[in-house]
Amino acid sequence: KCEDAADVRGAKVQLNGAGARYKAVFKVYAAGLYLPKKAGTTEEVLAMPGAKRVSVTMLREADSSELGKLFSRGMEDNMDKSSFSRLVPGVMRMSQIFSEHKKLNAGETFQIDWVPGTGTVVTVKGVPQGEPFKEPEFFNALLRIWLGPVPADWKLKEALLGKPAA
């Protein structure tokens, strides 16, 4: 269960939607999308100013380097080649962050926050990981993993956008 609201470096954000990521028949993680106000489309989410958060709680053990690779692939699948190539240094650093953790166990969390004026802050198990990613496009590219035209999980995309389960 995701909290109804969160604090992103002093900015209050509310739960827009939450759901589980399935791989085959297994729930892999639960994710929540937090925004300054409700949004029902990917375009609204990407265009919305202010702090934003994706919060993920693992529901089973996962290999962190595999998670990093899936993030990279999810970003690449949801943007054109030239946009992706500009973000490669950030993508490499993101993969590095996850591979340093070896694995994430059930119940462990990570957050990806957009902090206006600071950038994207990745927090794993409650600890901020290195310097913020400065480019706004990087956070939006991460969001597209879940909300883009080729989402990680269609049902999760609908849930994060606050749509009732079918």
Residue locations for each model-derived region?
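N-terminal secretory signal peptides
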Residues: 1-48
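Short aromatic-centered micro-motifs
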Residues: 6, 121-123
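Mid-length scaffold segments of soluble, non-membrane domains
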Residues: 39-117
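Short, intrinsically disordered, mixed-charge
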Residues: 73-80, 144-148, 161-162
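Short strand-turn-strand beta-turns centered on an Asx-Gly dipeptide
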Residues: 124-128
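Flexible glycine-rich active-site/ligand-binding loops centered on an Asp-His dyad
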Residues: 129-156
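Cysteine/selenocysteine-centered motifs that mediate thiol-based redox chemistry or coordinate metal-sulfur cofactors
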Residues: 155-166
